[in-house]
Curated annotation (Swiss-Prot):
The modification N6-acetyllysine is found at K16. Keywords: Acetylation, Heme, Iron, Metal-binding, Oxygen transport, Phosphoprotein, Transport. Heme b binds at H87. The modification Phosphotyrosine is found at Y24. O2 binds at H58. Pfam families: Globin. The lineage of its organism: Eukaryota, Metazoa, Chordata, Craniata, Vertebrata. It comes from the Eukaryota. This is Hemoglobin subunit alpha. Belongs to the globin family. The keyword Heme applies. SUPFAM superfamilies: Globin-like.
Amino acid sequence: VLSPADKTNIKSTWDKIGGHAGDYGGEALDRTFQSFPTTKTYFPHFDLSPGSAQVKAHGKKVADALTTAVAHLDDLPGALSALSDLHAYKLRVDPVNFKLLSHCLLVTLACHHPNEFTPAVHASLDKFFTAVSTVLTSKYR
């Protein structure tokens, strides 16, 4: 459960990210593919080389979904329902991959915003990414 302080930290951090969210999403995907090569199996049709246009484009989709989630922190299931359906029923992404991507998103944000990435912000973002992952995997059950 996200506390009021968590919500403030999440919104504040996302505001600071601003127009870089898509770039960070692509970088986090690159990190995921490099650190956890099994995640590449869901993208056989992509050029998975670091910085490829396809990885950047998908990273922007990830960032856009997270931006939607930030705007709907009080109703993540409603805001992410269609995306949950897509990942559960069509793409059939193994739920562990959301945790791996979440970790890489945290690393990416910490690298780009080290001064703002306090322990409290880290904890809030971790809780947020976990909440998003939980929603995205809720229809698997």
